[in-house]
């Protein structure tokens, strides 16, 4: 019995010793997939599992773990994780690089928009005989032209102008080619036109106390200066902000011995149609009635359009009439200046015949047989 027991112990020991031989085998190192896209793997090989310190029979679930070691599972998942990290890293770099690539693309688009905008050139020292078609022909070879303008004054061309191109690139090319070229003995200068700064200049009132300054002597002529009656025609812009002065002055000039028609009293002067702008001024001298008129020699009714028409726009057509005995009263002073106080004589009168109209650049006169003009 003892021998059988010792044999059973030995057999048990032998069976127990066989099990550790099977469990003592270390796990094989995991076989990782080769690196992809030339990027080295960021992981290291796992350490082998240490041998178990116990001895004994293993259960079936443990053998299933040996058939599917966790290292193998780790080796299969690690490359996927690495690939995911690699892809995400690449995507991040692409996103970061996207704005960098987009910035150069934005700048050319802005340059393209600037080149497609119109541009104006200032052309100076051009021949004085040049007109707009000549300047257009000179610059038209470089691109489409929107506008050509040569500056003129009353004497002719001022020798410079402006050319507007539809495309700024064409304008730059024309400036480079034509700047400094000699045309008819004159060196053309082409530069970029600069924007003109408009300043609010204070308008100088040419009137002193509402009356026009004489452009020759600079004296102020008003009704008080002439001892008599003045007829002031109503301005066309009455009631507007521009209506600040009389538009015309109607008067007659006389010489001693050349009387003018007598008329009714000064009460015939009714200023209702003058809207308060006209006024009658009486001098301190005796208002004597002149001698009977000379039928063959009449007066001259003169209206200077410069007083109203040229400054404030005035009337489109000047209206003039000669006073008649029924509508005018003559007052004379020691200098024999006669001023007509009229009722219906105004800028609106239509009693004018075209045969007496003599147009001039600034004035229009209603002339009768010309008198001998003497300066008093």
Curated annotation (Swiss-Prot):
Organism: Macaca fascicularis
Name by which UniProt lists this protein: RNA binding protein fox-1 homolog 1
Subunit structure: Binds to the C-terminus of ATXN2.
The organism's place on the tree of life at top rank: Eukaryota
One GO MF term: mRNA binding
Cell compartments where the protein resides: Nucleus; Cytoplasm
GO biological process, one term: mRNA processing
Pfam families xrefs: Fox-1_C, RRM_1
Residue stretches of biased makeup (Polar residues): 72-89, 102-115
Domain RRM: 119-195
Region (Disordered): 1-126
SMART domains per the UniProt record, alphabetical: RRM
